[in-house]
């Protein structure tokens, strides 16, 4: 019996933990905007966001990667509530955050990160949204344009002036600097 983690035997009892954690990856994104989904689920989004995080900030801690890896896992309990809905309904956002925190604690996936790491994870998360929707846009799905603009504006308003945002800002400028920029 392997007892390397918390003295808990590594047998069938852990299968439930694995399955519960994997369940979050099956949640479909953009359910309120299915025209922009392209079938993307949380697992695909998270992998892409982690690639962005590790590429732009390769020296961040393992906890930062784990924080991002599990950032949407609670959606298997709450559903994927759009960020714009949470922005419009502050009390809802607070209650959902409580549910997500409790669920993450139950699963043991709350990883301590610095404020900078938390920012970088959020930036990578939103950059992935912009990359995904820009890909849709460039394939002729102009319905994704407003999501691109909202994502770009969110990042610029929230992180402008913070040194760790500069690299992401440059990526956004390069990504959106073409004749098909949805803000034009």
Where are these regions (language model features)?
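Alpha-helical, largely C-terminal catalytic domains
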Residues: 1-184
């Amino acid at each position: 019996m392997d007892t390397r983690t918390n003295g808990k035997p590594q047998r069938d009892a852990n299968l439930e933990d694995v399955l519960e954690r994997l369940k979050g990856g099956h949640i479909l994104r953009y359910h309120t905007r299915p025209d922009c989904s392209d079938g993307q689920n949380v697992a695909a989004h998270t992998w892409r966001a982690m690639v962005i995080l590790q590429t732009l900030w390769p020296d961040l801690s393992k906890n930062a990667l784990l924080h991002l890896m599990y950032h949407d896992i609670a959606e298997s309990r709450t559903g994927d509530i759009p960020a714009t809905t949470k922005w419009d309904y502050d009390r809802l956002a607070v209650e959902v955050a409580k549910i997500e925190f409790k669920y993450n604690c139950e699963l043991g996936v709350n990883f301590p990160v610095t404020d900078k790491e938390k920012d970088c994870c959020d930036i990578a998360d939103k950059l992935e949204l912009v990359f995904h929707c820009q890909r849709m846009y460039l394939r002729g799905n102009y319905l994704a344009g407003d999501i691109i603009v909202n994502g770009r504006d969110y990042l610029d308003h929230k992180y402008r002036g913070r040194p760790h945002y500069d690299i992401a800002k440059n990526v956004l400028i390069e990504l959106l600097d073409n004749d098909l920029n949805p803000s034009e």
